[in-house]
Amino acid sequence: MKRAIIIGASSGIGFEVARLLLDDGWKVGVAARRVDLLQTIGNVSEAEQIDVTDPNAAEHLRSMISQLGGMDLLIYTAGIGKQNRELTEGIEVQTTETNGVGFVRMIGEAYRYFAEKGEGHIVAVTSIAGTKGLGPAPAYSATKAMQNVYLQALEQQAHARGLDIHFTDIRPGFVDTALLNGDFHYPMLMQPEMVARKIMQAIKRKQHICVIDWRYHLLTMLWRRIPRFIWRRMKL
């Protein structure tokens, strides 16, 4: 039986992916800050409270891997994101610590484990927000760009070392989860159940980059072609 661990599985995308993996016959371990919500997923083998900003979080992941009897797949869906047009320091720092430091801590630990094992698959839910610097959410878009590049760097390193480690960078747009501010109307809003199904397809195909929904794929292609002198004048 294949074994998967999901970091950030208490709600939204991670929650739905956990349910699909269970239906597909995987042995699943789940982790999040809100451990009480993990109990509602279903017949998971391990449920652990992990805060990715905790310096000891990587040790907790190692312990979880041991309790599960090993790991073949790591899915990382943890993260925060807020609009911060006033550039409030606390929001920027918290976002960077969670999406930056926390991401490196947990993805790095999974990579080291798979390097010892010789094979594995790391899947991370990042965002299309990493495509360009977004003025309404500076730290969020910056950390998402960092996540994209970090996965690419690890993929190159793994290949250079002859390691059979696969990487899948999942880049959704707006998803109807608690991460979004309910007072704002988000265009092209997607449901987490649909996103989870797309993630499962990407996992089975060992897809390198998966932009969820063709509309967001076209949008990011357009963004990349906008010159900087025009981009800085755009109101988002």
Put a short name on every predicted segment:
Residues 42-56:
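Rossmann-fold cofactor-recognition segment
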Residues 127:
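Residue(s) in the substrate-gating loop at a strand-loop-helix junction
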